[in-house]
Amino acid sequence: MKRFFAILGAALFVGNSGAFAEQATLIDFSKLVGEGNTGLHAPTTIDYSRQAGSAYSAEDKAAMKISLAIPSWEIELASSSQTVENQTLSLVTAAPVKQDAARYGGETVMGVRIHFPSFGINSFAVIKPPFTIPAYATLGDATAQNAVAGGQFDGFGVLKNVGVIKSIQINILGRNYLNRLSLLLEDQNGDEREIVMGYLNFDGWKSLQWNNPNYQTEVRNRDLQIVPLYPRSAPLIKLKGIKIHRDGSQEGGDIVSYIKDIKVIYDQAVVDRNSDVDDEAIWGILRQREEQYRNFELAKLGNLQVLRSLEKKKMAKEADFDQAAPAAAAARAPATN
């Protein structure tokens, strides 16, 4: 933990006391509302139809898209808790807040229901996006007027130019559960860290906050180094998931919560130098660096979604036995005196 947040950024501070902390939103679920009949969130939509074979029709392929819209998020239970009942009853949904609510009135937030085992066992559940959020994806046509090269998921689970993290905050509505909540974050090297935010033993909205105990407010006390800039200094963080722990001594069954957003206060890794040349626009090294990994992840995502689409077609459509057949048989039966 100390290495992740103290060395990351301290080593990238570029010896410039002009770097300053700023606040940014890592993700805001109220902005991840599905649109129209598709239910997709257009700015975060990914097309995985290229992973489908020729057996699929053009209509099927046109529907092979997925986004970060709230209902697309998944809950992954600990392996010891993955029973059919627990998995079926653990889900994510878009939850509207009442118009007259004191906070976030009229907005839509992420609603979470987790069904833990009824018996005493240590367990956890991870609320995770439907795919690994890419750091340098581009929305649609990279030449489009509003497209930002490599910036499709900026503010949708990705923050760039992140040096030393000072504080992290999650706005969440609790229902007096004793479960502990933590965040799973990943840096530009693929290293994942878990940040414990606190317990959900409160009722109503609350801002759970983590403060970096290793954050140095005095520049004189920082380990300042001069390091090469582009393309070396490209630190970032992205959200891997939201983890809720259940202690074996706690009561099992359902827990319910609602999540609005996650915010971060951090030092810039590199101060905007108002350079006369846009390095990334010319060389694209950062995008190329992630392209192979991203393509692998998207291929894996596409294969999974194609298999799910195929499985959905094979599933039984009937909710119950047809009552028409027994009724018709009864009508044909000869009358008895």
Curated annotation (Swiss-Prot):
Keyword Signal found: yes
Localization terms from the record: Periplasmic flagellum; Periplasm
Top-rank taxon, per record: Bacteria
Does the keyword Signal belong to this entry? Answer: yes
- Recite the UniProt keywords alphabetically: Bacterial flagellum, Periplasm, Signal
GO CC terms in record: outer membrane-bounded periplasmic space; periplasmic flagellum
Position of the signal peptide: 1-21
Q: Which InterPro entries match?
A: FlaA, FlaA_Spirochaetes
A GO biological process of this protein is: bacterial-type flagellum-dependent cell motility
Subunit structure comment from the entry: The flagellum consists of an outer layer composed of repeating units of FlaA around a core that contains one or all of five antigenically related polypeptides.
Function, in words: Component of the outer layer of the flagella.
Q: What is this protein called?
A: Flagellar filament outer layer protein
Q: Which organism is it from?
A: Spirochaeta aurantia
